[in-house]
A protein has these predicted regions:
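A glycine-rich phosphate/pyrophosphate-binding beta-strand-loop-alpha-helix module
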Residues: 53-102
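Extreme N-terminal cap/leader segments of soluble proteins
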Residues: 1-54, 73
């Protein structure tokens, strides 16, 4: 898949500064100016909270992993965008997960 993506010319002005495989992408937006973009979810890290019923560390983990990925490419984190995808809504669980997002 990565090989196929490398062959696509999008015609966009910005280009990736780093090769594929890094935890975050750095896009050139002007000469000598880039912006780092990263995304990461909690994935399998939800297994323990589901077993213990304690979700208050999930939000911390979301933020920490995204910030860490941006730092790993030498960028300074300035903003985080995340989302919460759930099958069913539970206000208490939602509040626990989001407690440390803000």
């Amino acid at each position: 898949l990565v090989g196929v993506l490398r062959t696509i010319d999008t015609g966009r002005a910005s280009r990736s500064v780093l090769p594929s495989g890094h935890y975050a992408a750095v896009l050139e937006v002007a000469p000598n100016l880039g912006i780092a973009v990263g995304t990461d979810g909690v994935g399998s890290k939800l297994i323990v909270p589901e077993q213990t019923g304690r979700y208050d560390t999930v939000g911390i983990d979301c933020i920490a992993m995204n910030v860490n990925d941006v730092i790993c490419v030498g960028a300074e984190p300035i903003a985080v965008v995340d989302y919460l995808a759930v099958e069913q809504t539970d206000p208490d669980t939602f509040a626990a997960i989001c407690r440390y997002w803000l």
